[in-house]
Amino acid sequence: MKKILGIESSCDDTAISIITESRKILSNIIIPQNTEHAVFGGVVPEIAARSHLSNLDQALENVLTKSNTELTEISAIAATSGPGLIGGVIVGSMFARSLSSALNKPFIAINHLEGHALTVRLTDNISYPYLLLLASGGHCQFVAVLGLGKYKILGSTIDDAIGETFDKVAKMLNLSFPGGPEIEKRAKLGNPHKYKFPKPIINSGNCNMSFSGLKTAVRNLIMSLKEVNDSVINDIAASFQFTIGAILSSKMLNAIRLYQQILNYYYENVDYTTNLNLKSFRQDEFNLNHLQDITRPKSRIYLQNSFRSNLLNDTIVIAGGVAANKYLQEILSNCTQTYGYRLIAPPMHLCTDNAAMIAYAGLERYNNKLFSPLNFCPKAKWSLEDI
């Protein structure tokens, strides 16, 4: 039985996991660093890298013990090799390559974002293709997931990432780190319509997003208030979260339209299995403001008849740390259901950074014999389109 060991160290969680070829998670160890970074209100890269260096040996021992596995039983070692905080990425990647060399087992460099993108294939066995909203501390983008290593970014944030925005607003409100769960908790107690915040570029007609103006609006409101008590904090958190939900819902509709248009274009003009030329696609070839409304039922019947039915997937996936937010899951699920799609998110413990997703991405690459050289250079920036 094949067993893949995955290592994740791109931010502030040291994680190692072992999964089997049948997608069973034998062990999924995470050593968090929240206490080390809480005093700073955010992740300090140097502290994170040093903590990874201290934690990896213990994490490996724990994962082997819990899974009742010997190192010699491991078939391949997969490790996050970008994007992320480069110090931590280097530490984890070097650790993995050392194991690979010592055990004479294949090394597989994994793009952290691909790990998030494929998590639902580990948990729900979703087939390709599907539309993905990747929302995390460092990224926010809509992605057409057309196959392993075949990704097209339909739109992304042009400034701050969504998770980063949650953390910064939480810090403004003197909430603890990490800020996302604290905002969600406080929002349940507040009035989402108390304060009206801007929704930057919401009417731009594309899938791009902007959160810096929203963050600034929250800061300006806080500075203008004479008193910021618990009730005010709850209302600000609720209004902020409501605004985020409205932005994502609006952009989701644009993404659905563009995604289906891409499928229709490529699967009628390109041999999907051998020659999917994503590099040739330019978003400006498709004017969203003049597209047929393919989200309507009659149009979806047309789509089902216009290209191979096995390629029509009614699943939309939300992944990344922000996907753990139950409010946003509900809002986006209601939005997608209106247009005939179902929204799926990984279990909460697999939304945030973990090594099981890295091990699974490694399994898919292992099965396709997509191995990496031991001199693979870790990357601080690494787009899904450049894998």
UniProtKB/Swiss-Prot annotation:
Pfam families: TsaD
Positions contributing to Fe cation binding: 112, 116, 353
Comment on bound cofactor: Binds 1 Fe(2+) ion per subunit.
Keywords linked to the UniProt accession: Acyltransferase, Cytoplasm, Iron, Metal-binding, Transferase, tRNA processing
Cellular component terms per the entry's GO annotation: cytoplasm
Top-level taxon in the UniProt lineage: Bacteria
PROSITE patterns membership: GLYCOPROTEASE
Family matches, as Gene3D superfamilies: 3.30.420.40
Protein EC: 2.3.1.234
Binding site for substrate: 134-138, 167, 180, 325
Cofactor(s) of this protein: Fe(2+)
Reactions performed catalytically: L-threonylcarbamoyladenylate + adenosine(37) in tRNA = N(6)-L-threonylcarbamoyladenosine(37) in tRNA + AMP + H(+)
UniProt record, GO biological process: tRNA threonylcarbamoyladenosine modification
InterPro entries in the cross-refs: ATPase_NBD, Gcp-like_dom, KAE1/TsaD, Peptidase_M22_CS, RPE3, TsaD
Annotated compartments: Cytoplasm
Cytoplasm listed as a keyword: yes
Gene Ontology MF annotations: iron ion binding; N(6)-L-threonylcarbamoyladenine synthase activity
HAMAP family: TsaD (MF_01445)
Family according to the record: Belongs to the KAE1 / TsaD family.
Cited function: Required for the formation of a threonylcarbamoyl group on adenosine at position 37 (t(6)A37) in tRNAs that read codons beginning with adenine. Is involved in the transfer of the threonylcarbamoyl moiety of threonylcarbamoyl-AMP (TC-AMP) to the N6 group of A37, together with TsaE and TsaB. TsaD likely plays a direct catalytic role in this reaction.
Protein name: tRNA N6-adenosine threonylcarbamoyltransferase
Gene symbol of the encoding locus: tsaD
